[in-house]
């Protein structure tokens, strides 16, 4: 915590990425979560990279950053979460009010800047979390910076499992479950395998954002062995 509070804000971009990578791996170990990477994640030196994944838990951002340090676009409500919100803010998360078109434009510009600075950007385009047994329709609006910058979009699927391979629903952060209840459920597990599966990157050159979103969504669904079963609430940027 002291590192995030005092060292991280003053560190160089390269040092920040190293610290986020270290902290994410440390947190997973503390929670008895073992990451299992399948497929090829964005290489450490790859620029203009974006990771797009399904969303199950607040742990997702640390799972992804344990593989490749990443700055995430996340709903503004996360900033108010105990501990996780503070950590996310310190780690450079880009918070967005999805119900306000002006904020969508601000985040669009900021994501472009972050990509151009060489940081990897992470998106959870379902907009809400699930238990991991379904995939909601992807919002398309936040794919625009990737298309504008010709970024490589890496589809990723997240699945939390018990040691026997069954879905660990206790990892999900859904409904009325509070952050403290989520912590208690996670700590109640002897061990959890966190699978993060990567599909080949989607080239955005000359593509429309809706086409990119559709291709990425299909890749994530395939990795999970699922089909999209619903639609996340619409936002102004999707219209």
List where the protein language model places each region:
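Catalytic core of membrane glycerolipid acyltransferases/transacylases, capturing the structured
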Residues: 1-17, 21-22, 28-31, 44-101
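Soluble, non-transmembrane catalytic domains of enzymes that act on hydrophobic metabolites at membranes
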Residues: 25, 30, 34-40, 59-61, ...
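Generic preference for hydrophobic
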Residues: 37, 51, 72, 196-198
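Residue-level preference for the first positions of well-ordered beta-strands
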Residues: 48-50, 93, 120-124, 152, ...
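A cross-family acyltransferase "interaction/gating" segment
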Residues: 83-86, 132-215, 226-235
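A membrane-cytosol interface segment of integral membrane proteins
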Residues: 94-115, 120, 218
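Catalytic-site beta-strand/loop segments enriched in glycine and acidic/polar residues
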Residues: 114-143
């Amino acid at each position: 915590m002291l590192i995030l509070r005092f060292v991280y804000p003053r560190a160089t971009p390269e040092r920040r990425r190293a610290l986020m990578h270290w902290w994410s791996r440390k947190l997973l170990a503390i929670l008895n979560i073992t990451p299992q990477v399948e497929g090829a994640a964005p290489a450490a030196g790859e620029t203009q990279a974006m990771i797009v994944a399904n969303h199950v838990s607040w742990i997702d951002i640390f799972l992804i950053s344990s593989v490749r340090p990443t700055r995430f676009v996340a709903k503004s409500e996360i900033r108010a979460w105990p501990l996780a919100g503070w950590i996310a803010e310190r780690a450079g998360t880009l918070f967005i009010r999805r119900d306000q078109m002006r904020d969508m434009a601000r985040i669009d510009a900021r994501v472009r800047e972050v990509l151009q600075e060489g940081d990897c950007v992470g998106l959870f385009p379902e907009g809400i979390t699930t238990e991991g047994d379904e995939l909601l329709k992807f919002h398309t609006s936040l794919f625009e910076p990737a298309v504008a910058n010709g970024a490589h979009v890496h589809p990723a699927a997240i699945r939390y499992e018990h040691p026997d391979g069954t879905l660990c629903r206790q990892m999900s952060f859904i409904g009325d479950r509070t952050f403290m209840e989520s912590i208690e459920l996670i700590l109640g597990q002897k061990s959890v395998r966190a699978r993060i599966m990567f599909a080949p990157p989607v080239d955005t050159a000359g593509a429309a954002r809706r086409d990119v979103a559709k291709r990425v969504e299909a890749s994530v669904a395939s990795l999970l062995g699922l089909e999209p079963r619903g639609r996340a609430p619409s936002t102004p940027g999707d219209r």
